[in-house]
Amino acid sequence: MASAAGLLLLAPFFALIALAIKLESPGPVFFRQERVGRHGRPFRIFKFRTMTVAPPSGGVPLTVAGDARITRVGAFLRKSKLDELAQLIDVLRGTMSLVGPRPEVPRYVAHYPPEWRERLLSVRPGITDFASVRYRDENDLLAQAHDPEREYIDVILPTKLQYALHYVDRPTFANDLRVIGLTLSTVF
């Protein structure tokens, strides 16, 4: 219900974002990608498109700062995290929550420690979480790495999973409010 109200209130803003995306580059307004949701069920996440449309490369599903495919509008949307607002559609559809561990692509879920996997996938993924706040500058960190994917798997992902476990093991309304507050403070 809250996501429907949010979508309704944000509809004019969504229209402006969509118009800016379409005016800058051809292609769809939304970027869709398979992610792993609650109980390991795959779903296709919504995000506002921030990159030029290119054929799937089969390469690494990571984007680093300075990637030439990122459009000017896309750079703004990424920096402000406005590209994530489209995930309110996923919340409305019931595949995501406002707060919860961020959903990963299957390629990285395969790196979850087996003893944690069931717990980590026992809740609906969220638009934001403690790891989103901590790694707000993830693209910049990955751009500095010699091997961005290795850096993600060996350094960033384990820390994100620790944050996710903390959230899963302490699911309180107060924690949700704290995450939302921290997220808003990093965006504004």
Model-identified regions with their sequence ranges:
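A hydrophobic, helix-centered structural microdomain
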Residues: 1-55, 90, 167-188
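Short charge-dense sequence patches
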Residues: 20-26, 36-39, 83-85, 126-136
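Short, glycine-rich, amphipathic interfacial segments at transmembrane boundaries or analogous
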Residues: 31-69, 131-157
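Intrinsically disordered, low-complexity boundary segments flanking structured domains
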Residues: 15-19, 34, 109, 116-122, ...
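A short, structured surface patch at a secondary-structure boundary
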Residues: 63-130, 178-180
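Short amphipathic alpha-helical surface micro-motifs
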Residues: 11-14, 25-30, 79, 103-104, ...
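C-terminal terminal-structure detector
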Residues: 121-188
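Positions in alpha-helical segments
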Residues: 3, 31, 71-75, 107, ...
